[in-house]
């Protein structure tokens, strides 16, 4: 691994962790596997992280922060309706299959590791808060209308989006990507 500043090295490691997670899940992560993905010695992993759990937690936080930043860009560059559809319909995001696999695995890992569960909960709550904030802003500006609290609408939309995206990760569930888009669009129209 070429010389990089400490934060750049950590970011490179996080990306390698997430690449491995997309293939094997968080349960399949080893220091050796991540080092192999990096083309580096395992010492680089042990130098930056005290434990495998710390590395997993840090990588998930990195992924969540990247997702939130990307969502902010989408909301800045698009009207609220198309922006909501774009962030809730994961198929519209490049590498959506990898993203879906990472989040499916994160939910599973949260059941095995109390430390990871805290980080997973923070990531989901932060996404909900971001979405709720945009919904509230849309309701306040008059762009959106909702009979129920935007916090509740945000939870409903997070649940629908995540569940349907999880289904698309399997080649053996009959729902299609177009059907998922239609359902998400319908939920947006019904809720707002």
Where are these regions (language model features)?
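N-terminal intrinsically disordered/low-complexity leader segments
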Residues: 1-8, 170
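Helix-turn-helix
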Residues: 9-12, 16, 20-54, 58
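Hydrophobic alpha-helical connector segments
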Residues: 58, 69-101, 150-157
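Short, basic, alpha-helical segments at the C-terminal edge of helix-turn-helix-like DNA-binding modules
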Residues: 61-67
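Amphipathic alpha-helical packing segments from all-alpha helical-bundle domains
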Residues: 68, 73, 95-104, 114-141, ...
């Amino acid at each position: 691994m070429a010389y990089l500043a400490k934060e750049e090295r950590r970011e490179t490691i996080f990306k390698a962790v997430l690449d491995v997670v997309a293939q094997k899940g968080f349960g399949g992560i080893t220091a050796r596997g991540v080092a192999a993905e990096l083309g580096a010695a395992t010492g680089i992993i042990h130098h930056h992280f005290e434990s495998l759990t710390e590395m997993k937690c840090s990588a998930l936080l990195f992924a969540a922060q990247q997702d939130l930043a990307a969502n902010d860009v989408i909301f800045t560059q698009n009207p609220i309706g198309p922006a909501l559809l774009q962030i809730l319909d994961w198929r519209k995001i490049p590498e959506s299959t990898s993203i879906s696999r990472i989040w499916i695995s994160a939910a599973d890992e949260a059941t095995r590791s109390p430390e990871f569960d805290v980080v997973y909960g923070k990531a989901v709550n932060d996404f909900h808060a971001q979405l709720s904030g945009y919904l509230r802003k849309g309701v306040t500006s008059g762009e959106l209308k909702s009979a129920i609290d935007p916090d509740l609408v945000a939870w409903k939309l997070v649940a629908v989006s995540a569940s349907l995206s999880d289904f698309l990760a399997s080649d053996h569930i009959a729902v299609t990507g177009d059907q998922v888009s239609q359902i998400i669009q319908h939920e947006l129209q019904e809720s707002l």
